[in-house]
């Protein structure tokens, strides 16, 4: 900013992972200051990777992202915290314009997004991991790309949270061997009895990346996990579940994983925005032109079939074929009340965005569309996500995901090989039933959050705090009142939105 000081500093926003401030210089110029919270991710790596990702996208791929003016990857500075100073983009968030856009504007925005994603998909990264500047990473842990950009360890918080930061686990970077794109060569090499240099190349396949989360959690569970009751909302247990139940399922996944790997470009190292939501896309005021995409914290380079998918603002059901029918509003839309109109318009816009994003991707980003056509891609990605969740005695969804993938009608579309994991019909029925109960529980919990106006972690805006606290108290009491005899205490204890130190007993009926 070339100013001695900023006479005006104002907080713009605060979330679970960042505090955002506006700094105004004496000449009136404004910049954004982002300070990560302690839970945002690993110290140094989180900030260093976000900066390098934005710089790479802006300088190399010429994409509209904020310019970084200065940053610090250490808290040993006058601020006392890591920070990023970046350009303040004078734009309107797509979320603020979403329901007022015309269909033609939605089409235009989806085309722009698809074209930007194509530029990212077209870049050939040599490895999986996160982006960094050379100066911000130890030379032993970097793989050069272009200019001073390198690939280093994954900066995702999941790989560093809690005990993981002190555990020897695979965080990358993982260089991609050209051999991994030619499975017939790998098949030959794997039969060789001796460990030559070529044999080592087999270990550099996408499989290392796909299984890293499962191997990470197994390492942590084996060292630190203890038996505990399941505390899932509406599905708690009054008995302990042993961690071996979790590691057993992860072991079964590791048997399945090699069959999920796709050769060639399907596994190409690909960068993707970690949260391409409406609020992270900025438009030029009064237009449909995208002028900036923000919040690249936690962006990683992973196999393409792990990265492919639809943005959150698309209403896409991966279990159903993509419909080409143009969505429309009901004939009696104009006769509805304002609230009902907003609900109907929101659904209509999601369906519209899904259709035009699909069309734009098919025309402008063929590489992405090819991956989206992989049979049961959504089920495979869901299973991969489940393998990365920490031990909490709730393995319902991991088990259900494994059961789903190994169902003969599904497996036959994924692999021509025999499935290495088998479940009895009784086990399958039990897993599906538990999963249905879990989904019903989550739907109810979602309604609770909506009623209280709180986020997933129970956070809310300051103006809503007192109302949320009182509403939460009443709902908790009502939950206990409706519980079956003998279940009141466990329902009270397992209420999801209570203080950690709350060891109180339920009120007497």
Curated annotation (Swiss-Prot):
This protein's UniProt keywords: Cell adhesion, Virulence
Gene Ontology terms describing biological process: cell adhesion
What highest taxon heads this organism's lineage?
Eukaryota
> For this UniProt entry, which segments traverse the membrane?
none
Task: Summarize induction of expression.
Answer: Expression is regulated by the hypoxia responsive morphology factor A (hrmA).
For this protein, the record's Pfam families field holds:
APH
Task: Report the InterPro entries cross-referenced here.
Answer: Aminoglycoside_PTrfase (IPR002575), Kinase-like_dom_sf (IPR011009), Mito_inheritance_9 (IPR051035)
Function, as annotated, reads: Part of the subtelomeric hrmA-associated cluster (HAC) containing genes that alter the hyphal surface (such as reduced total chitin or increased beta-glucan exposure) and perturb inter-hyphal interactions within the developing biofilms, resulting in a loss of vertically aligned polarized growing filaments. Consequently, this hypoxia-typic morphotype (called H-MORPH) with altered biofilm architecture leads to increased hypoxia fitness, increased host inflammation, rapid disease progression, and mortality in a murine model of invasive aspergillosis.
Q: Which PANTHER family does this UniProt record tie to the protein?
A: ALTERED INHERITANCE OF MITOCHONDRIA PROTEIN 9, MITOCHONDRIAL (PTHR36091), AMINOGLYCOSIDE PHOSPHOTRANSFERASE DOMAIN-CONTAINING PROTEIN (PTHR36091:SF2)
> What is this protein identified as?
Subtelomeric hrmA-associated cluster protein AFUA_5G14880
């Amino acid at each position: 900013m070339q100013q001695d000081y900023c006479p005006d500093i104002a907080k713009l926003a605060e979330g679970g992972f960042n505090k955002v401030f506006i700094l105004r210089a004496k000449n009136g110029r404004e910049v954004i200051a982002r300070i990560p919270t302690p839970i945002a991710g690993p110290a140094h790596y989180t900030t260093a990777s976000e900066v390098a990702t934005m710089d790479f996208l802006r300088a190399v791929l010429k994409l509209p992202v904020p310019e970084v003016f200065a940053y610090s990857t250490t808290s040993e500075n006058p601020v006392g915290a890591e920070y990023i100073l970046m350009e303040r983009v004078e734009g309107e968030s797509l979320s603020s314009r979403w329901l007022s856009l015309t269909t033609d504007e939605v089409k235009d925005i989806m085309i722009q997004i698809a074209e930007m994603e194509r530029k990212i998909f077209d870049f050939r990264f040599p490895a999986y991991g996160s982006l960094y500047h050379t100066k911000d990473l130890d030379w032993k842990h970097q793989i050069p790309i272009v200019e001073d950009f390198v690939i280093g360890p994954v900066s995702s918080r999941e790989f560093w949270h809690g005990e993981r930061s002190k555990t020897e686990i695979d965080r990358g970077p993982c260089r991609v061997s050209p051999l991994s794109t030619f499975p017939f060569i790998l098949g030959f090499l794997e039969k060789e009895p001796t460990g030559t240099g070529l044999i080592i190349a087999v270990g550099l396949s996408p499989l290392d990346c796909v299984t890293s989360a499962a191997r990470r959690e197994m390492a942590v569970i084996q060292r630190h996990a203890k038996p505990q009751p399941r505390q899932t909302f509406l599905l708690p247990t009054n008995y302990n579940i042993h961690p071996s139940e979790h590691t057993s399922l992860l072991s079964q996944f590791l048997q399945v994983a090699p069959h999920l790997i796709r050769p060639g470009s399907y596994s190409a190292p690909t960068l993707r925005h970690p949260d391409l939501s409406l609020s992270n896309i900025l438009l030029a005021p009064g237009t449909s032109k995208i002028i900036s995409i923000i919040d690249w914290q936690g962006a990683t380079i992973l196999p393409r079939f792990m990265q492919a998918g639809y943005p959150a603002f698309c209403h896409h059901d991966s279990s159903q074929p993509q419909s080409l029918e143009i969505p429309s509003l009901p004939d009696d839309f104009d006769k509805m009340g304002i609230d009902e109109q907003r609900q109907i318009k929101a659904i209509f816009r999601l369906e519209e965005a899904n259709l035009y994003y699909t069309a734009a991707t098919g025309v402008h980003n063929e590489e992405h569309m090819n991956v989206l056509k992989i049979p049961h891609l959504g089920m495979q990605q869901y299973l991969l996500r489940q393998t990365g969740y920490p031990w909490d005695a709730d393995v319902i969804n991991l088990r259900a995901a494994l059961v789903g993938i190994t169902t003969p009608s599904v497996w036959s579309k994924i692999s021509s090989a025999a499935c290495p994991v088998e479940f009895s019909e009784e086990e399958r029925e039990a897993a599906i039933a538990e999963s249905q109960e879990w989904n019903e529980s989550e739907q109810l919990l979602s309604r609770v959050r909506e009623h209280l106006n709180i986020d997933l972690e129970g956070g809310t805006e300051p103006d809503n705090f007192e109302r949320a606290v009182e509403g939460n108290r009443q709902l908790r009491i009502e939950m206990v009142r409706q519980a079956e005899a003998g279940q009141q205490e466990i329902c009270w204890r397992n209420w999801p939105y209570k203080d950690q130190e709350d060891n109180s007993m339920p009120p007497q009926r």
